[in-house]
Curated annotation (Swiss-Prot):
Its main location: secreted. It comes from Candida albicans (strain SC5314 / ATCC MYA-2876) (Yeast). Belongs to the AB hydrolase superfamily. Lipase family. Class Lip subfamily. Keywords: Disulfide bond, Glycoprotein, Hydrolase, Lipid degradation, Lipid metabolism, Secreted, Signal, Virulence. The keyword Thylakoid does not apply. It is an enzyme of class 3 (hydrolase). This is Lipase 4. InterPro entries: AB_hydrolase_fold, Lipase_secreted. PANTHER family: LIPASE 5, PTHR34853. The gene is LIP4.
Amino acid sequence: MLFLLFLLVAPIYAGLILPTKPSNDPFYNAPAGFEKAAVGEILQSRKTPKPITGVFVPVKIQNSWQLLVRSEDSFGNPNVIVTTVMEPFNADPSKLASYQVFEDSAKADCAPSYALQFGSDVTTIATQVETYLLAPLLDQGYYVVSPDYEGPKSTFTVGKQSGQAVLNSIRAALKSGKITNLAEDAKVVMWGYSGGSLASGWAAALQPNYAPELGGNLLGAALGGFVTNITATAEATDGTVFAGIMANALGGVANEYPEFKQILQNDTDKQSVFDQFDNHCLADGVINYIGKHFLSGTNKIFKSGWNILKNPTISKIVEDNGLVYQKQLVPKIPILIYHGAIDQIVPIVNVKKTYQNWCDAGIASLEFSEDATNGHITETIVGAPVALTWIINRFNGKQTVSGCQHVKRTSNFEYPNIPPSILNYFKAALNILIQKGLGPDIQKDQVNPDGLKKIPILV
């Protein structure tokens, strides 16, 4: 009996020899002279050290690689990113989905290229669970690329760094044919939810000027739980069970802007708390800061409270990283937006403003599918069939909407022509989530803190 148990457990145990974290992995280091390479150039490559994770078991796919890619930060300074390319069985080398995870962290060891590997730390559980969203893309036979778009400084919520990294990741993937067998002229669709939508949205908006040559490859972008104003998310989450998202965001912006970091440091007498903002992944960050007040209340971390946003330096940085303020940046590719009307983490008001900005600017194709009964958490699942249906239609050459179209449905499960297998897949996922003890009002983003603390063992 013990021998049989060993036979069952041994393969799993072998898989749990942990992958090396980015902070200790030389592959992530920029090689000498990398600055001379063009953006999007592959500097080195390797098979992923571990298989792609399915949380408890590896995902069975044909192959996966990591590419070290030349990119640049918000100021045009050269840097490198790692991107992960996944090849399913019976892959179609003419189709590539660029999936941006909601990393939502200011810590290097939370990078998707590490988190997507089987055996990665439990603190990366949010990214690990996102393989549930990746699976239908792979099942369609699409190659999938997922970049470490926050870059080597882990600049969570920094728009330009993120968008440029996504585009340079796509450039690299399209040049990787000798490694991956992906066609250089492959068609590409981008997809991201929440923090991943921020990166995807910035990529779509920057593409006409930053990567115009990709215009012939890109078929569109699906943006869910669309983050266009980081201040609004801070206001919505401060002092709530999701305050950790705000802490991670402050850490991410501080990683890119030293002057931002200095102003925050000078405004707190709780330096030990501030010093930990870049030391959490999404799940442990949320759990660690439940109910914490950073800019509100009598025991806030920053003495100036919300008045700190009136500081001209802070105000400019915040606006520079909010798509809602960038009226001059308008995508030229078709766009799908899906969002929950009762989202308590990313308020829909700024999504509507961005939608209107793009419509007023004459965007060629913008579809907005608004869900009346779901908030940020459950829309991750309920909105996914919308994105997948739209993506499949894009790859199959079906026509997108002409101009702007905004439709509000009771639930995005009602989106037209969702393939039954995809709809059933995500309905089952929603039922599992609701039954996991996070609270009876989870669809309204009202989460039981005790249930939230169980996240690592819920999945």
